[in-house]
Amino acid sequence: MKNLFLFCRAGFEKECAAEIQQRAGELNVGGFVKANNNDAYVVYQCFEDDAADTLVKQLPLDSLIFARQMFAASDLLVDLPENDRISPIVAALSDVSKAGEVRVETPDTNEAKELSAFCRKFTVPLRQHLKKSGSLLAQENPKRPIIHVCFIGPGRAYVGYSYSNNSSPHFMGIPRLKMAADAPSRSSLKLDEAFGQFVPKEEQEERIRSGMNSVDLGACPGGWTYQLVRRGMFVSAVDNGPMDEKLMETGQVKHYREDGFRFEPQRKNIYWLVCDMVEKPARVAELIEAWAINGWFKEAIFNLKLPMKSRYKEVTAILETMQTILKENGVTDFKVQCKHLYHDRDEVTVHLWLRPNTAWN
């Protein structure tokens, strides 16, 4: 297969396209992008047959900022007959053998999601035929490739596969999170999703645990503080504005009515630093850099608000500058990840982990 299909948020196709063009070039996989505004997906068409397999194997999905999910794809199947959509799809997947799962999906747009009910019904007979053809195992296997069938419109679909070790575990790359009734704001879901995105399940018990000390800069009214409290942490909530009363009643939160940019923690045994302030992204990055250079935290999650134009260029420039400044100031052992999360809008979420191979005392 020569195409790479990437899911993204509607309105961010240009950013996703610019990113995959650059990242594919770094792997010497030549090609060109096909993208339309508000389609919520991008297709990177490789010049060489089967080159998409190189990308789904060697380009880590977690290293892409704007792609939620990706899979190697056939050319677009069009005019699928209403009386037999299955046969052309099974034929297009003839080179896929013993996959462990099939997902029938759509892009994340209102128009495409009108096909959701059809996709659910269609999955059952398609699964049966794929098992008969040998493309799909009789029993689901989380270690085998995943077959993707993405309907972009009635009778029009991209089909292909991803590898389970380089793929989102979520349908369409979207985690299904529920808004807690007592959460102070919807922004709470951003940190909830970020923990799942940046901290593997098998490490969460060690890295996100009860009793840890944390700081929330720009905390009001407490959406992100809520997620820290829910996980049993003690929180220094820094904001001139008021905090949610129920959060304060937990006894786990100390409210500092201060400017987050001027706050200096009294305790230096802070594990988590979180920050979701409506500020220029470069200024927020400088703040996190200062905390990192001072060694005031172990892991940080923070949001960078995006400009209206050149969003991919701006984000990558800020992240590159951050890494340079940290290294120039003696902070050389760290890991940075960045993702445009489902619950993000005009922003991206960054994870900075200091000394990832050194245990926290």
Swiss-Prot record:
Q: Which residues form the active site?
A: K305 (proton acceptor)
UniProt-annotated location(s): Cytoplasm
Biological process GO annotation list?
Answer: methylation; rRNA processing
Cellular component terms per the entry's GO annotation:
cytoplasm
Give the record's subunit note.
Monomer.
Kindly state which keywords UniProt assigns to this record, in alphabetical order: Cytoplasm, Methyltransferase, rRNA processing, S-adenosyl-L-methionine, Transferase
Q: Which family does it belong to?
A: Belongs to the class I-like SAM-binding methyltransferase superfamily. RNA methyltransferase RlmE family. RlmM subfamily.
The name on file for this protein is Ribosomal RNA large subunit methyltransferase M
Any Pfam family matching the protein: FtsJ
Q: Which one of the record's GO molecular function terms can you name?
A: S-adenosylmethionine-dependent methyltransferase activity
What reaction is this protein's catalytic activity? cytidine(2498) in 23S rRNA + S-adenosyl-L-methionine = 2'-O-methylcytidine(2498) in 23S rRNA + S-adenosyl-L-homocysteine + H(+)
Task: Return the HAMAP family for the record.
Answer: 23SrRNA_methyltr_M
What is the first-listed, main subcellular location in coarse terms? cytoplasm
Query: What is this protein's function per UniProt?
Result: Catalyzes the 2'-O-methylation at nucleotide C2498 in 23S rRNA.
EC number(s) per entry: 2.1.1.186
Q: Where does S-adenosyl-L-methionine bind?
A: S187, C220, P221, G222, G223, D239, D259, D276
